Amino acid sequence: MEVGVRAALGLSLTGMSGLSLISPAWFQSLSSSYGIFTYCSWPPGDCWNQSCVTFGSLKDMPSLAWKVSAATLLGGWLLLSISALLLSAWALAPRRLFARTGFGPTPVVQAAAAVSMLVGLLVFPATLASPFAKEICEGSSMYHSGACRLSWGYATAILNMVLTSLLVIRWQVTTVQRAAVPFSSETQRAILVPE
């Protein structure tokens, strides 16, 4: 059952990470926003009429920091996808095929995914020094957002990275010895009995 729960968590984290990667809402100003792969702009006061552009390749991205961040974040997402698929196969495979004594290589793959995503998330704010970001976020510089503010896409990516790193931990399952606790009918409180 634990493998099934980990597989479900891995698949949901993969989906959430994918959504945050394609989100254009990592840094946002009053009339535009951008993410790792997408940029959107809109007329002031009319945020429902957005025009969005996707960076087609690494060549289209404005700076080296942007390219490094995109490559490491996408690599982390691919590793997370692989680990989720491995865990799903592990959970759905017949028990007679192999003994389920561990999780195989998935903790290592998940740890590599978490490290890759961490590197990408730490490098991404350096994109604020690019001419593209300076045009959107007036007064921005490396690790200073200027007129922009962090938005939900970047926060979701950080949360996904933290949850992925927690997924690596194999929680120790302990068996609790059950004992009857006597109750007093007068006070209706538990009486502690030393062993």
Swiss-Prot record:
Transmembrane segments: 7-27, 73-93, 108-128, 149-169
Record InterPro entries: LHFPL
Domain of life, per lineage: Eukaryota
Subcellular location(s) of the protein: Membrane
Keyword Transmembrane helix annotated: yes
Record has Glycoprotein as a keyword: no
GO CC terms, sorted: membrane
Keywords, alphabetical: Membrane, Transmembrane, Transmembrane helix
Major localisation: membrane
Any Pfam family matching the protein: L_HMGIC_fpl
Entry coiled-coil feature ranges: none
Bilayer disposition of the protein: Multi-pass membrane protein
PANTHER family: LHFPL TETRASPAN SUBFAMILY MEMBER 7 PROTEIN, LIPOMA HMGIC FUSION PARTNER-LIKE PROTEIN
Family classification: Belongs to the TMEM211 family.
Name of protein: LHFPL tetraspan subfamily member 7 protein
Species name: Mus musculus
